[in-house]
């Protein structure tokens, strides 16, 4: 695997020097300062690429070129935003950047309720608490019809939880959910959030798939033409939330994408922490079935709790993800490619490390502190080395 590291640009508290010292050779970044929908110019791409290369690194993957909400709802100037997206892909290819991670999650990107969940060893992790989320949706957001998405027991638990919350607790929970996490391109006030949710009132899973298919049929031929590989990121968490449909959550969704636009430019990001939240997702089977189309991997693990919809981010080699079998399947896919004459390594980044050690005293991007990811990268690197030596050394 090609070892990479997500970097949020010049304002990231983790520097490119830190990235290089961690042992990564590739950088995963994006032009976050450019508003959603606007074209990334060759000049802006080259400026960022030069900064990365001056540090002795390579810009390996774009994460992400965000998709304007008009495209997802098929309203407003969606055709203009698609044309702009096409041009951005052409410009990236002109600059020698050929792997693009993106997602099609409506309104919100990845969602958590607690950004500072304290683990038994004192480090901090990200957590999604189903009951706290229900408390937000039922008693703070007050979304009409939300009760239908929860069991009677969950509704009762959410009411009790809400009753114990201080005003600061409510404000923090609201911020965590709607204010935008690292990599998310949209942040909202509560009223703006309600308005954005309302735009999906008549959009179910079938309709959102229809809009996604329209996007893919416009984008993938351009990507194919210029040599760009599109790698869709799964929903996080991989199930409907807030009354919004989710359409990249299961192996069936992956198969639908391939059947909708059967081009090798139409590929996947294997995010084990997102897909792995669902017990019915067999990660190794996903890799084996769609290996030739996996162009990027996010390796992390989560641990489901007593309520299986509640989870927190575990250490990279613990939790519900069998990281050994996952890495072995990825390495096998790379060797399959090599046997066919390709030396195409799959970029991998350690995802969402714990906040730990000296980083506990620093201001960090949630999930993206340096030391926890350094630990995760080192552990995954060790697993890969052992697999390479045990099964593939001559």
Curated annotation (Swiss-Prot):
InterPro entries: Man_deHydtase, Xyl_isomerase-like_sf. Pathway: Carbohydrate metabolism; pentose and glucuronate interconversion. Disulfide bonds: none annotated. Its cofactor is Fe(2+); Mn(2+). It catalyses: D-mannonate = 2-dehydro-3-deoxy-D-gluconate + H2O. GO terms for biological process: D-glucuronate catabolic process. Pfam families: UxuA. Keywords: Iron, Lyase, Manganese. The keyword Magnesium does not apply. One of its GO terms (molecular function) is manganese ion binding. Its EC number is 4.2.1.8. Belongs to the mannonate dehydratase family. Catalyzes the dehydration of D-mannonate. This is Mannonate dehydratase.
